[in-house]
Structure formats: structure tokens, C-alpha cells
């Protein structure tokens, strides 16, 4: 009697465990949803030089931190392997959160890229060639590099940032008339001799055999034979219309 009872209890144990497992509620349903990220306060500090960013580069705090070196001089990129990627990260700040090892501009919240901040822009332009340094060389992210490029171009257009214009001395050979394409084109030899430019422009005597064939063909309609054209057309006397009108009444009166 004890054996069948124990066997029945062993059959009921998996059923009870299965029912308790189905009744379990996941922990995610019990968690409350946090406030949206838009309503969350920004963790970034507020910069006092946002309206006038050029004053920060003249402050004592800037000189104590960077000295006379550029802001990207002591920056080292953090990447995997020994060969750095050819492009830097897209941006260092996402959803008001700063990534690890931010770029030289994103790590200092008092640095602002502005076309009026000439001292900051000069640090990203080569002093000898005027070429803007590439992003992998300075280490700035691609978002800040795009802002730097636009600010440098606008500063050059406004005359705030000087740039190099190469001076090229013109060569005398470029303005000479020695070249054949620049000199006067000589006339054709046929024009100097008085002959026409094309041979079919002058009179060509047709062969006698062809003339005899045409005479037989057009024997009933041929009135007279045409010879070669005259060398020059006869010149007609040209008189002004006023003189001719004056002479006519005079001749009638005479």
C-alpha cells in the first residue's frame, strides 16, 4: 500500500513544479520605466566662454593647462592594435554623455569652435603651407573636424585668418609672338601666284570626246557653243542717282 502511494506522489511532483514555473512573473514587468533621456538633466558642465570663446585662450587657466603648445599636442589616441585607424570616431558626445578618452576639443568644455576664435583655428592649420591638418594627425573626432574646416573657411572669407597665396612670376615666353600659333599666318602659295584656291574654281576645258557626244545628243536643241568665260567682267559706268536726275532735265532743256 505504501509503494503505490509513493509512486503516485512522485508522479504529482513534476506537475506541481511545472505549474509553479508557469506562474512565475518576469522581473522586467515589475520594473518601473525610468524618465526619458530628453527630460533628464544634462551631465555636461556649462561653459562661461560660450558666447565669447576667444577669451578662454587668453585666460590664465588656459596657459596653466596647455602652455604655449597646441591643444592636441599631448593627446594620444586609444585604439586596438599597433596601427591606428585611418579615421577617428564620428563623435565623442552622444546623448549628453562623453565617451572615454574624448578628442582634444570635446574633452575641454571651455573650447568652442568658432570662426572668430582665430587663435584656436591657427593651431589646426599648417603655418608653412596653410593646409588644414587631418583628423588622425590632431586626433579630433570627425564631427569637430567638420566644424573646424567650416570655421576656417569662413574665417578666411571674412579676413580674420590669413592664408598663403603663391606668387608666380610670369615668363616672357608666355607672352611672346615667337610661336607659330601666335604669329600671323602666311598666305597660301596658290594665292600668291594668282591661281584659285581649289582647282575646280578655274575653267577646265572638257575633253573633245565628251563634247562630240553632247553635240550628237542635243543636236536639235543646241543653238550655240559656249566658250571659256572672259577673264574679267566688263565694267559698267556707275553714276550717282542725284547727278543722273540733274542731267536729265538739262538735256531736255537743251
Curated annotation (Swiss-Prot):
Task: Kindly give the Gene3D superfamilies that the UniProt entry links to this protein.
Answer: Ribosomal protein S18
Keywords (A to Z) from UniProt: Mitochondrion, Phosphoprotein, Ribonucleoprotein, Ribosomal protein, Transit peptide
Tell me, what is one Gene Ontology molecular-function annotation carried by this entry? structural constituent of ribosome
* Entry superkingdom: Eukaryota
Q: Where is this region: Disordered?
A: 218-254
Q: Where is the composition biased (Pro residues)?
A: 227-240
Tell me where it resides.
Answer: Mitochondrion
- Listed GO CC annotations: cell junction; mitochondrial inner membrane; mitochondrial small ribosomal subunit; mitochondrion; nucleoplasm
The GO biological-process annotations, alphabetized, read as: mitochondrial translation
Subunit annotation: Component of the mitochondrial ribosome small subunit (28S) which comprises a 12S rRNA and about 30 distinct proteins.
Q: Which family does it belong to?
A: Belongs to the bacterial ribosomal protein bS18 family. Mitochondrion-specific ribosomal protein mS40 subfamily.
What the entry lists under PANTHER family is as follows:
MITOCHONDRIAL RIBOSOMAL PROTEIN S18B, SMALL RIBOSOMAL SUBUNIT PROTEIN MS40
Provide the protein name. Small ribosomal subunit protein mS40
Amino acid at each position: 500500500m505504501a509503494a503505490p502511494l509513493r509512486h503516485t506522489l512522485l508522479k504529482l511532483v513534476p506537475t506541481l513544479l511545472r505549474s509553479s514555473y508557469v506562474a512565475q512573473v518576469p522581473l522586467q514587468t515589475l520594473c518601473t520605466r525610468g524618465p526619458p533621456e530628453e527630460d533628464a538633466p544634462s551631465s555636461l558642465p556649462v561653459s562661461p566662454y560660450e558666447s565669447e570663446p576667444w577669451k578662454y585662450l587668453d585666460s590664465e587657466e588656459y596657459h596653466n593647462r596647455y602652455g604655449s603648445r597646441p591643444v592636441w599636442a599631448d593627446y594620444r589616441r586609444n585604439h586596438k592594435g599597433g596601427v591606428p585607424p585611418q579615421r577617428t570616431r564620428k563623435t565623442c558626445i552622444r546623448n549628453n554623455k562623453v565617451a572615454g578618452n574624448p578628442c582634444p576639443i570635446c574633452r575641454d568644455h571651455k573650447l568652442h569652435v568658432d570662426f572668430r576664435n582665430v587663435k584656436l583655428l591657427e593651431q589646426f592649420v599648417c603655418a608653412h603651407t596653410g593646409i588644414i591638418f587631418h583628423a588622425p594627425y590632431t586626433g579630433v573626432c570627425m564631427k569637430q573636424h567638420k566644424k573646424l574646416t567650416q570655421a576656417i573657411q569662413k574665417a578666411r572669407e571674412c579676413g580674420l585668418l590669413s592664408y598663403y597665396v603663391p606668387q608666380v612670376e610670369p615668363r616672357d615666353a608666355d607672352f611672346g609672338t615667337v610661336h607659330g600659333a601666335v604669329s600671323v599666318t602666311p598666305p597660301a602659295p596658290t594665292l600668291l601666284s594668282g591661281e584659285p584656291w581649289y582647282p575646280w574654281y578655274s575653267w577646265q576645258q572638257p575633253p573633245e570626246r565628251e563634247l562630240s557626244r553632247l553635240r550628237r545628243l542635243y543636236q536639235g536643241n543646241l543653238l550655240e557653243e559656249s566658250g571659256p568665260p572672259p577673264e574679267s567682267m566688263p565694267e559698267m559706268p556707275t553714276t550717282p542717282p542725284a547727278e543722273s536726275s540733274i542731267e536729265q532735265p538739262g538735256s531736255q532743256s537743251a
